[in-house]
C-alpha cells in the first residue's frame, strides 16, 4: 500500500482477503507513514499486520516501531535499478544501514520485550548477498531483480542483441507510479522519478 490512497485501498485489500499489509515508500521516516499505520490500527486493531519503511538508521526504525509497525523494511537507494540517491541525495550503504537498524531492533526488544522483524530491501543481486544480509541481522529479505529473471515473473520475455531478457523496472519509476504502487504522500505534483526501466538476463 502507499500513504496516499490508503483509506480506499486498505479496506478493499482486507475485503479481498489480505491479512498482511506493507507501506511501500523510499522514505519511511515520515508523518505520512504514521498516519497510514494509525488508520490501519484504528480500523482493524491487531487483526491485520502492517509493515513500514524504508529506513536506514536507528532513528527511523524507532519512529516506525513506536508508530506501531509490525515489521520494518531497511534500505534506501540500494536497489539495482533504484536512483533515489541520485535524484534525492538520500540513502546509505545497505550493510551499514542493516547493521545499525538490527542493533536498534535488538535494543528495542531488550527495553520493551517487543521484537520487530526487519527486512533487508535492495542490493541483493547474488546468492551470497542473501547470506550476508541475514548474517548482518535481517530477519527476512525483499528481492526484485533476482526473481524478475525467471518465467514466473509477470513481465515479457524479449530478445535484445541476440539474448533473452525479461523486462524489469524500479518501484519508483514512472511506469510503476502509473500503477500507484510507490508513493510518499502529500501533493502529487511534488514527485521524483526514483527508478528506471531496464532488462535482466533471462534465467529460465
How does the language model describe each region?
Residues 1-4, 16:
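Catalytic alpha/beta active-site cores
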Residues 67, 89-120, 125-204:
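Alpha/beta catalytic cores of nucleotide-metabolism and tRNA/nucleoside-modifying enzymes
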